[in-house]
Amino acid sequence: LWRHRIPLDEAENLSRQVAGALNYMKAHRIGALVVLQQETGLGDYWRTAVHLSAEISQELIISIFWKDNPLHDGALILDRERMTAAGCYLPLADAPEISRWYGTRHRAALGLSEVSDALILVVSEERGEVSLAYKGHLSKNLKDAQMEKLLFHYFSGRETVRRTWRVRLHRLMQLFWESPAQP
């Protein structure tokens, strides 16, 4: 996907909007599935979704996942500048080694992460925590600082430094994977 450069102050604002929504939903135990699209096109997952071309805002993200909203059970897809689709159905991971700890949102996040390069953030309504799925791995209970750093790197990514961004993300994910899992 071609993307023009996003000024750093705008990347910081977008990061704050998404982090604010995730933190609100975490605190209020509102389940959510937010997909940060990268290079892999996700058009196949828009078929049953509501197509959007909306500015990324904390309030709109929260309202999409509000329990009485008909879109709340599906995923929200963002690119680096806009919210592009809501109510998306994602492929579920079907690996038998996946713990029963994971619910449908976590399985959907893992499933999409196995077939795309997307970063998928999951808010657990049962535990009130945010997890990240990337390349078939799930990092549970992200700390606020980790989530904010990840979002800022995502929104501020530049084509000319994409390789560096991916190396940093890979290193960050290795740290998450190496930390002991907490039930």
Question: PLM features: what roles do these ranges have?
Answer:
Residues 1-183:
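Divalent-cation
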